[in-house]
Design a protein with these regions (language model features):
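A short glycine-rich, His/Asp/Glu-containing loop-to-beta-strand
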Residues: 2-45, 50-53, 101, 128-168
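Histidine-centered metal-chelating micro-motifs
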Residues: 43-44, 61-63, 80-82, 86-93, ...
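Short, conserved beta-strand element in jelly-roll/cupin
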Residues: 47-63, 105-109, 160-163, 172-187
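Contiguous mid-protein beta-loop-alpha structural module that forms a pocket-lining wall or clamp
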Residues: 53-108
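Short acidic-glycine-tyrosine-enriched beta hairpin
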Residues: 66-84, 172, 187-211
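Surface-exposed beta-loop interaction hotspot
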Residues: 82, 92-150
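Ligand-binding loop in jelly-roll beta-barrel domains
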Residues: 85-112, 202-231
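Hydrophobic secondary-structure block in the mid-to-C-terminal portion of proteins
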Residues: 146-200
Length: 235
């Protein structure tokens, strides 16, 4: 936790020293699910370099400050920001009371990114197109038709909204699909997976499951083996 418990978090992928369910894989380096159970809380100015750092507002509001913008920028539920931290940037973030975010770090090939100037972009929820598939729909956050640009190789990010019933996701060849259940629950391989569950799927043609209620699932698709050596491979 941060700030004496004002910010609580679980880390599907954590830093080596603080423990995560998994070590870095693909070009995913770090993934934190963070929330404020009560009062708002601020994480003060701190530096980053090399990585692409994305924040996804799942609930409530956050405020972002960095040394490129030099001002506080508000973001609300459904909004996304990306810091391409390049050769260095410092930022601070304030998470409002009863708010919830993902912060996810991607490795864009540090041998190249560390030579670039840092850049920042934020995107409103309405910038992302919603595709209706009948008993489910999904929002394309990174991928075809999305305005959000990432340097990290072959990354797609979707948010799925599923009605009760049977569903399947296609699994791409040479890709790993990382899933986090934001709301609801599913039955997968006869096991109940509840809100807050993180899992990955690869080397399959599809994943078939049943949603026992209205469910929201966050998906990141990334290469099983990036074409470059990642930071975690070099350490």
């Amino acid at each position: 936790n941060f700030n004496y418990g004002e910010i609580l978090e679980k880390k599907p992928i954590g830093f080596p020293q603080d423990g995560g369910k998994l070590k870095p894989y693909s070009n995913l380096f770090y993934w934190a699910h963070a929330w404020t159970p009560g009062t708002k809380s601020t994480i003060g100015l701190h530096p980053h370099q090399g990585f692409e750092i994305c924040s996804f507002v799942l609930k409530g509001n956050i405020n972002h400050f960095d040394t490129k913008q030099n001002k506080w920028i508000p973001l609300k539920e459904g909004d996304v920001q990306i810091i391409r931290s390049g050769n260095g940037i410092s930022h601070a973030e304030e998470i409002d009371d009863n708010s919830e975010i993902f912060q996810i770090w991607f490795d864009p090939d540090l041998s190249k990114s560390l030579k670039k100037e840092a850049t920042y972009d934020d995107y409103s929820s309405k910038d992302f197109k919603l595709i209706d598939k009948g008993n489910r729909s999904f929002k394309v956050i990174v991928g075809e038709g999305s305005p959000m640009h990432m340097d990290s190789e072959d990354v797609c990010i979707n948010e799925h909204y599923l009605s009760e019933g049977n569903h399947s996701f296609d699994i791409g060849k040479d890709l790993i699909h990382s899933y986090f259940i934001i709301d609801g629950e599913i039955i997968l391989d006869k096991k109940k997976l509840e809100r807050g569950t993180f899992f990955t799927v690869s080397s399959e043609n599809e994943v078939v499951f049943k949603s026992s209620e209205t469910t929201k699932i966050f998906e990141i698709i990334s290469p099983l083996t990036p074409s470059y050596r990642t930071y975690s491979q070099l350490r």
